[in-house]
Amino acid sequence: MAFSDYKHIYQVQTDYQIEYQEDNFLIIAEYNPSNQIIAELEFNQKNIDIFSSEAARCETIIFPILREVYQNYAEKTALWIQKSIAYDEKLNGTPDYMISKRSPLGKTMLELPLFIIVEAKKNDFEQGWGQCLAELVAVKNMNGRDKQSIYGIVTDGKLWEFGKLVDKIFSKNSDSFILNELSKLLGALKFIFDEVTKEIV
């Protein structure tokens, strides 16, 4: 069974006894986008059919936005694209994007995963969260730290939803964020990067 076989959150809840709740755990300070990201997104939206496929959304929207914030944390963290992970026969697969602790051995070594980003296939957020929560459970078990917050994001490029798993409790942030409010979206990402880098010893 792979992460993508989980189509709904309740399937992961049933298999792993995960409690579900909603609250606003993100503390947002608006982030001033760089001229580079503004120009890149404007160019892409003007010249490319950015919503024509999953690959188009990932390459022209999702990755540039992640990179915009990630570059400020590159000394401590590593950004992975389509990096396969496996905890056991049921919890395995390939997250779209993953942030981990940066290994002292270099960028080719995967250290503790810190958060996961899932592209919502066919704009299906319900399935996206089923897959994302399965990935969060795998990461929590791989890390062996029940009390550590593991963050997840599900996005179709336009809409960004956030969640976190702590021990057996999954919290979905009540507020979501949209591409057209870029500074708030980047602020939400910055909050998560700030939180996960606190976990790095």
Labelled PLM ranges:
Residues 2-3, 16-21, 26-149, 161-201:
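A short, conserved, highly charged catalytic patch centered on acidic carboxylates
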Residues 158:
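A generic "binding-loop/recognition-motif" signal
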Residues 151-154:
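A short beta-strand->alpha-helix segment at the C-terminal rim
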